């Protein structure tokens, strides 16, 4: 007998969001995670020189689901203890700057565009006119339209300084193939409801401390279980529950949320592939391509003294720099991010670190010699968010079986918010069906 227990396969942000939601509703939850650490593709990494993250993440003020979960597991003081909230500020020192003023939406965006530095007046006005057209269309475009096509009439300077960096950072997909509609969804969420929705929320702690650790405590304190280094190799739906195979053991659960990476899904679904819905989901997932993200950590023997904790770089090769001294109290530590498949990021990590060090000396200047570096490459950091892509919906997959993951169709690219929304959707559908 299952005794009403629920299993969640996958201890990333989607799986933990589902597990926290189920636990909060009084269900006994067991989380299975193949790795020895929770967090999935947004986790802490322990180095000889200290603790970092496998990638530098930021949240937006519009990420209500994620913020709600953080408050559930941490309490009310998520800000400023765990997240530093700043009004939208994008800057390439001496070249470009966009700052959102403290005005209601959408005036904060329109004013920010009108006052952009590094862009001529004519181009600023053209950008404002473009955003006004988007508002009239309610931020909708044909599903197969790429971001490049969407921006075809935009000034080159604005595309280069604003739209392309935002697209690459958010969708991790080049303009030429990225989904115009998903890009517009992000703009709509950030700039059309509340002024604070466009705020940047920068983590002040490592990603493990931000959510996975506290989520695990929340689950365990309420009678749940976290099983690390437990690989689930098989899933089979039965008349009275779902049988999971982990190692030599088989256990029966009342229902299961599958929240593994999309590239891991097909193995789990082998016994279910005859079901029509499962076959359709498997086909959509098999069609996904993936994009890497590379994060280089460079440590200098003294503080960086950057004007902002996050600055845009020139892409040769680093695209963004985060001052971990300002954010995490780690003076001299920089996290430099390269999204999408930049040629330099494919090579030797030591050479890449040297190239980024040279880039920072060129752009920032007044830097001492590098103390140490560590490059972390996530080869499947996100799915390629291309135009016209069909993704499976989160939630019911087969009787007693539910799907969650940042690759599911949540109107968002592969973000922390997309992951947590999918987990909550799956959990709520499960709760509604299995009282």
Where are these regions (language model features)?
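N-terminal Rossmann-like FAD-binding beta1-loop-alpha1 element of flavoenzymes
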Residues: 4-31
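Glycine-rich FAD pyrophosphate-binding loop
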Residues: 23-47
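Glycine-rich active-site loop/strand segments that organize a redox cofactor
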Residues: 42-61, 128-135
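Mobile amphipathic helical/loop "lid" adjacent to a hydrophobic cofactor/ligand pocket
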Residues: 63-72, 76-180, 184
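Helical element adjacent to the flavin cofactor pocket in flavoenzyme catalytic cores
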Residues: 186-244, 255
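Conserved flavin/dinucleotide-binding core of flavoenzymes
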Residues: 319-435
């Amino acid at each position: 007998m299952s005794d009403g227990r629920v299993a969640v396969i996958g201890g990333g942000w989607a799986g933990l969001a589902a597990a926290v939601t189920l636990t909060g509703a009084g269900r006994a939850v067991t989380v299975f995670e193949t790795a020895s650490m929770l967090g999935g593709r947004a986790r802490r990494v322990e180095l000889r020189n200290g603790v970092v993250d496998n990638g530098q993440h930021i949240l937006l003020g519009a990420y209500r689901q994620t913020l709600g979960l953080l408050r559930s597991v941490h309490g009310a003081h998520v800000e400023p203890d765990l997240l530093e909230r700043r009004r939208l500020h994008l800057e390439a020192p001496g070249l470009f700057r966009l700052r959102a003023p403290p005005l209601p939406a959408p005036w904060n965006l329109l004013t920010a565009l009108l006052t952009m530095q590094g862009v001529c007046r004519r181009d600023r006005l053209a950008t404002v006119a473009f955003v006004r057209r988007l508002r009239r269309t309610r931020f909708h475009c044909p599903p197969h339209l790429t971001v490049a096509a969407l921006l075809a009439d935009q000034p080159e300077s604005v595309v280069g300084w604003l739209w392309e960096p935002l697209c690459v950072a958010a969708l991790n997909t080049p303009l030429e193939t990225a989904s115009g509609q998903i890009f517009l969804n992000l703009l709509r969420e950030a700039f059309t409801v509340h002024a604070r929705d466009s705020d940047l929320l920068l983590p002040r702690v490592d990603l493990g401390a931000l959510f996975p650790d506290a989520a695990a405590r929340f689950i365990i304190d309420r009678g749940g279980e976290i099983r690390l280094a437990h690989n689930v190799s098989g899933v089979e739906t039965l008349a009275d529950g779902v049988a999971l195979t982990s190692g030599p053991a088989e256990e029966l659960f009342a229902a299961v949320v599958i929240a593994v990476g999309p590239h891991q899904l097909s193995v789990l679904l082998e016994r279910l592939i005859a079901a029509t819905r499962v076959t359709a989901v498997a086909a959509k997932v098999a069609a996904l391509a993936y994009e890497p993200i590379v994060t280089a950590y460079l440590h200098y023997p003294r503080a960086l003294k950057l004007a902002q904790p996050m600055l845009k770089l020139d892409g040769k090769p680093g695209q963004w720099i985060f001052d971990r001294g300002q954010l995490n109290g780690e003076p001299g530590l920089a996290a430099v991010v390269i999204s999408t498949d930049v040629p330099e990021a494919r090579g030797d990590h030591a050479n890449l670190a040297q190239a980024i060090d040279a880039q920072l000396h060129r752009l920032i200047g007044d830097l001492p010699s590098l103390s140490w570096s560590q490059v972390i490459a996530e080869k499947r950091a996100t799915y390629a968010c291309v135009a016209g892509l069909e993704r499976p919906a989160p939630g019911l997959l087969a009787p007693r079986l539910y799907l969650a993951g940042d690759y599911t169709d949540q109107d968002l690219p592969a973000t922390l918010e997309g992951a947590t929304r999918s987990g909550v959707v799956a959990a709520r559908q499960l709760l509604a069906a299995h009282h």
